[in-house]
Each structure stands twice: as structure tokens, then as C-alpha cells.
Swiss-Prot record:
Belongs to the D-alanine--D-alanine ligase family. Cell wall formation. The keyword Cell wall biogenesis/degradation applies. Binds 2 magnesium or manganese ions per subunit. InterPro entries: ATP-grasp, ATP_grasp_subdomain_1, D-Ala_lig_Van_CS, D_ala_D_ala, Dala_Dala_lig_C, Dala_Dala_lig_N, PreATP-grasp_dom_sf. It comes from Mycobacterium ulcerans (strain Agy99). Residues 156-363 form the ATP-grasp domain. It catalyses: 2 D-alanine + ATP = D-alanyl-D-alanine + ADP + phosphate + H(+). PROSITE patterns: ATP_GRASP (PS50975), DALA_DALA_LIGASE_1 (PS00843), DALA_DALA_LIGASE_2 (PS00844). GO terms for cellular component: cytosol. This is D-alanine--D-alanine ligase. Pathway: Cell wall biogenesis; peptidoglycan biosynthesis. It is found in: Cytoplasm. The lineage of its organism: Bacteria, Bacillati, Actinomycetota, Actinomycetes, Mycobacteriales.
Length: 373
């Protein structure tokens, strides 16, 4: 069912959050911020949490329950509401049905889904595929771009094929335990060891000697059997938001900069999970203090990076600004939407307030529809 068939009524937006990934808590926090900022005059919001075990739960949508409180991370549980399912059958028209007891009862019907899921089993094309099967429009990238954007190896392959600047890296698939001599020489030290399909800096280690690599690889593999090792790049950390509008045009936001080195004991400059979400230790400059020509070049690169993976809807593109120019580091197809997250802050600094930003994403999803495009 589309919003246009219910003229004069509010659009029903299902905000889906939580999920099975190790970024479950950050997804909850992002959803809380979105629930506070979706315009209630335009949207009827349905809040659906996914437990760490994968159960879908219809919740009351209370944003306060989705906040980090005294360093305690929020979590969806089966007691958070009524368990439900979205049938992968377009004939159901976006209806959400209860699971036993009362199996099959229609609990709600939605016009569009806002999948605020970070990491595997959500941001990686899986829920996007379900929504395509179910015939329900959704905010953000499609199946291919979501999968490619989640996997750092394939993101970099697509960027390299498009002639975009990326840093040295090597990939360890599950059958490989260590880097070879050529890779070690090419990457040098220090280096960063990361789960290939993760985010929020979870499982990431900075190594300053090759002796530290085995432990760092093991730490990353607790989150993903595939690991990527990246050369450390000496440069300022810049970010840029890309937003698609209902008419298909793309715009890049004002830039933001993350500064961690020397902040509250973080002389290594490593923007890890605790620095991001628990300690509030990073300094964020929005807009970033860069020359206009540099900002323009980074914004153009952000849109090229977005297009190179066939992205849709939105993305945050992360850069290092080196003496030789910008280098693209990562792209997030569903960036954080917490109160400290750079993506909404950069758009606010660009003159797009938070409710308008969210409304644009929903309108773009409805304009795009589903299926091949």
C-alpha cells in the first residue's frame, strides 16, 4: 500500500531497530533519536525492535528506553512488546502479523520501512532483500549497495575500479591466519585490524608492531571470520554526508572533522567504540575548518564514492585528508543517527534540520519504490 492511496492521512512509517549484530545497542540509540524527530503531523510511527536473537517485537516506541544511561547500553528483548512478523509475500501489502498467541492477527500495516539497523543482518542487504520480497518501500540503499557497503573488501574493490583514491590494505579470509611478507612490507606500521563487515569500531585494533598482529586478528575474528588490515594513514579525519532527493538528485553536506589525538588520554588518535559512545571524548568540528577548494573536492569525491557502489538514499563517507589530497576510508549506508552522530549534524549545518532530513529520506524511499530500478 502506498501513501498516495491514502490522501490526507499520515504516512505509516515502521522504524526498525536493534537486530542481531554487535551494533545492536547503537541501532537502538539511533532509533530513539529518529523517533523523537519524525514529524508526528506527517507520520504515524510504528516502532519495531529486533532482539539479539532475531525476534521482531512491536514496541511502544518510547525513545527514553533506547538511550545509553550511566554507560548501560539499551537492548530489545522479547518482553519489550508483542512478537510479530513481516510476511515475505507482497499480497500482504506491508501488514505486520502477530506470532502465537493470536497467530496471524494483523497488528499494523505500514507504507514504508525505515531500517535503522547497523551491521550484519540489517545494514548488509538482508533486511533490504526481505522488504523487496514483501513489496514494501524502504529508506536507504538497495540490496547490492547495502551488501557492498557493509563489506570493506568489496567497497574498496569498487572504488579502485572507479579510479577513486583508497589506502593500502590486505584481506584475511577465514582460511588465512596471517599476512605474508610482501603484505607486511606494503602496509607498514602502525596498522589497523578490523572485522571486514563491521562498524562502530567494534573489534578494531591498532597495532604498532607485527608481534601484535595475531592477537589483533583474533580480536577481529570474534566478530567476523573475514578480517581486513589497513595501513595507518596520516591525515585529518573528515566526513561528508550524501543525500538523495525524491527527484533523484544527489547533494553532499558540509564537512565534519573528528579530532581524537590528545583528547582525554587518547594520544593514539584512535576513535574507538568507547570514545564514540561512552566517554564523549572526541572533539567534533561541524563544519570542518578546511579551505573551500578542499571542501569542494571532498564533497565531489563523496558523491563519486556513493555512485561507485550504486548507493541510494543516504550515506556517510569517511576520508583522510593527507598532504597529497583526500583518501576515501569507508562508507556507511546507514550511518548513526544518535544525538552525537555526524550525519545529521552535518546536514543541520548545511541548513537541513533533523525533521526535514528524515522526511526527505522517507519521501525518497516512496518515490523510488521497490523492484529493479
Amino acid at each position: 500500500m502506498s501513501g498516495s492511496s491514502r490522501r490526507g492521512e499520515r504516512l505509516r512509517v515502521a522504524v526498525v531497530f536493534g537486530g542481531r549484530s554487535n551494533e545492536h545497542a547503537i541501532s537502538c540509540v539511533s532509533a530513539g533519536s529518529i523517533l523523537r524527530n519524525l514529524d508526528p503531523r506527517r507520520f504515524e510511527v510504528i516502532a519495531i525492535g529486533i532482539t539479539p536473537q532475531g525476534s521482531w517485537v512491536l514496541t511502544d516506541g518510547n525513545p527514553d528506553a533506547l538511550a545509553i544511561t550511566d554507560r548501560r547500553l539499551p537492548e530489545v528483548s522479547s518482553q519489550s512488546g508483542t512478537e510479530l512478523a513481516l510476511p515475505a509475500d507482497p499480497r500482504w501489502g506491508g501488514q505486520l502479523v502477530s506470532l502465537p498467541p493470536g497467530a496471524g492477527e494483523v497488528l499494523a500495516s505500514v507504507d514504508v520501512v525505515f531500517p535503522v539497523l547497523h551491521g550484519p543482518y540489517g545494514e548488509d542487504g538482508t533486511i533490504q532483500g526481505l522488504l523487496e520480497l514483501a513489496g514494501v518501500p524502504y529508506v536507504g540503499a538497495g540490496v547490492l549497495a547495502s551488501a557492498a557497503g557493509m563489506d570493506k573488501e568489496f567497497t574498496k574493490k569498487l572504488w579502485s575500479a572507479a579510479g577513486l583514491p583508497i589506502g593500502p590494505h590486505a584481506v584475511l579470509r577465514p582460511s588465512r591466519q596471517s599476512l605474508d611478507r610482501e603484505e607486511l612490507q606494503r602496509l607498514g606500521l602502525p596498522a589497523y585490524v578490523k572485522p571486514a563487515r563491521g562498524g562502530s569500531s567494534i573489534g578494531v585494533s591498532r597495532v604498532s608492531s607485527f608481534d601484535e598482529l595475531p592477537a589483533a586478528i583474533a580480536a577481529a575474528r570474534r566478530h567476523d571470520p573475514k578480517v581486513i588490515v589497513e595501513a595507518a594513514i596520516n591525515g585529518r579525519e573528515l566526513e561528508c554526508g550524501v543525500l538523495e532527493f525524491p527527484d533523484g538528485r544527489l547533494e553532499a553536506s558540509t564537512l565534519g572533522e573528528i579530532r581524537v589525538a590528545g583528547v582525554r588520554g587518547r594520544e593514539d588518535g584512535f576513535y574507538d567504540f568507547e570514545t564514540k559512545y561512552l566517554d564523549d571524548a572526541a572533539e567534533l568540528d561541524v563544519p570542518a575548518k578546511v579551505e573551500d577548494d578542499v571542501a569542494d573536492a571532498v564533497r565531489q569525491l563523496a558523491i563519486r564514492a556513493f555512485e561507485a557502489i550504486d548507493c541510494q538514499g543516504l550515506a556517510r563517507v569517511d576520508f583522510f585528508l593527507t598532504d597529497d589530497g583526500p583518501v576515501i576510508n569507508e562508507l556507511n549506508t546507514m550511518p548513526g543517527f544518535t544525538t552525537i552522530s555526524m550525519y545529521p549534524r552535518m546536514w543541520v549545518a548545511s541548513g537541513v534540520d533533523y525533521p526535514t532530513l528524515l522526511a526527505t529520506m522517507v519521501e525518497t524511499a516512496l518515490s523510488r519504490g521497490i523492484g529493479l530500478r
